[in-house]
UniProtKB/Swiss-Prot annotation:
Compartments, record wording: Cytoplasm
SUPFAM superfamilies hit by this protein: (Trans)glycosidases
Organism: Hydrogenovibrio crunogenus (strain DSM 25203 / XCL-2) (Thiomicrospira crunogena)
Binding site for substrate: D72, R80, R146, K176, H177
Encoding gene per record: nagZ
GO BP field: carbohydrate metabolic process; cell division; cell wall organization; peptidoglycan biosynthetic process; peptidoglycan turnover; regulation of cell shape
Main location per the UniProt record: cytoplasm
Annotated pathway: Cell wall biogenesis; peptidoglycan recycling
Official protein name in the record: Beta-hexosaminidase
Source species, domain of life: Bacteria
UniProt catalytic activity: Hydrolysis of terminal non-reducing N-acetyl-D-hexosamine residues in N-acetyl-beta-D-hexosaminides
A Pfam family this chain is assigned to: Glyco_hydro_3
Enzyme Commission code(s) on record: 3.2.1.52
């Protein structure tokens, strides 16, 4: 059957990526597959504000309900779009600000969340995979200053403030990487990661910031591609123990569970891409990322059989952005001007003090 543009089709369960700054014909065809739920964008997909808005508009016009468009736009070293966007501080810098002055730290975190979300929503991006609420134990190469702090109470407070800013702007939040990625040194993009701690230690420390956000209506969680063998032999993103028993039943989380990228090395030991995706879905993920490997993405779409249930679909629909400002209004908006200036001033002061990592 010929696929028609703008056709009514429920969201699926797979998030894919794009090769460049424009949507190619074969990519349009891929995005019209019923299994697809959305697109994750990277730096390679960004050339200019105008180009990005044209790209997101084209993606959103393909289907109804609209495909989700997401990006990793945390701040610091993980900010996919730079020129034309406000530079955002690393979360670790917000943690230092909090320790110097709690009130100022919380206010700044809320403003950073609002600024990040407002600018992305204005160009058609639905949500950012943020905040990182891992704890900074000082040894993790991949987490480091992406984390607010080592103290779970501080991380919970700052995460809550950042999420509130995102929510005020109309953006859903995705807390990562459950149940905690900060303790281990390994980078799961490159290698298998194992955390040998007991469940009680993880629960009393790393899970606490997630609980704080769940209490305040967290929209989504991304599990870690990390093994915790004292709890389950499977990495959290493939584990019914972590996703169903701990996250759903013990933490009372009812939002979306979004897997980390199935192409990361830590996931590849579980068979080919269709096998990995199916395992993650069966474990309890509502949405699975397949990035940086278009062959694997097409294998998944042709071989995986999965029907998104009404509850999963509702969870994903809630991730659609609800921005209040259009791009043409943004720079003339007094609130944007004030918050962009405040965040820029903070970054300048950090640079002057030599606190940048």
């Amino acid at each position: 059957m010929e696929k028609l543009l703008g056709q009514a089709m429920p969201l699926g369960c797979i998030m894919v990526d794009l090769e460049s700054t424009t949507l190619q014909p074969h990519e349009k065809e891929r995005l019209l597959d019923p299994l697809v739920a959305g697109v994750i964008l990277f730096s390679r997909n960004y050339e200019s504000i105008e180009q990005l808005q044209a790209l997101t508009t084209e993606i959103h016009q393909l289907r109804h309900p609209k495909l989700l468009i997401a990006v990793d736009h945390e701040g610091g070293r993980v900010q996919r779009f730079k020129e034309g966007f406000s530079m955002l501080p690393a979360m670790g810098q917000l943690g230092k600000c909090f320790r110097a002055n709690e009130k100022e730290g919380l206010e700044l975190a809320q403003q950073v969340g609002w600024l990040m979300a407002t600018e992305l929503l204005a160009v058609g991006v639905d949500f950012s995979f943020a905040p990182v609420v891992d704890l900074d134990y000082g040894d993790s190469r991949v987490i480091g200053d992406r984390a607010f702090d080592s103290d779970p109470v501080i991380v919970g407070k700052l995460g809550k403030a950042l999420v509130q800013g995102m929510r005020d702007a109309g953006m859903a939040s995705v807390a990562k990487h459950f149940p905690g990625h900060g303790y281990i040194q390994a980078d799961t993009h490159l290698e298998v990661a194992v955390d040998h701690r007991e469940f009680q230690e993880i629960a009393h420390k790393d899970i606490q910031p997630f609980l704080k956000l769940i209490e305040n209506g967290l929209d989504a969680v991304m599990p870690a591609h990390v093994r915790y063998p004292k709890v389950d032999d499977l990495p959290a993103g493939f584990s019914k123990v972590w996703l169903q028993e701990v996250l759903r039943q013990q933490c009372y989380f009812d939002g979306a569970i979004i897997s980390d990228d199935m192409s990361m090395h830590a996931a590849t030991e579980f068979g080919d891409a269709p096998t990995r995706v199916t395992a993650a879905l069966k474990a309890g993920c509502d949405l699975v990322l397949v990035c940086n490997d278009p062959v694997a993405a097409d294998e998944v779409l042709s071989q995986v059989t999965w029907e998104t249930g009404p509850l999963s679909h509702a969870r994903l629909i809630r991730l659609h952005g609800k921005g209040h400002l259009k791009l043409s209004q943004l720079h003339n908006n007094p609130l944007w001007q004030s918050r962009a200036s405040h965040v820029s001033h903070f970054l300048n002061s950090v640079n002057q003090q030599g606190l940048l990592v």
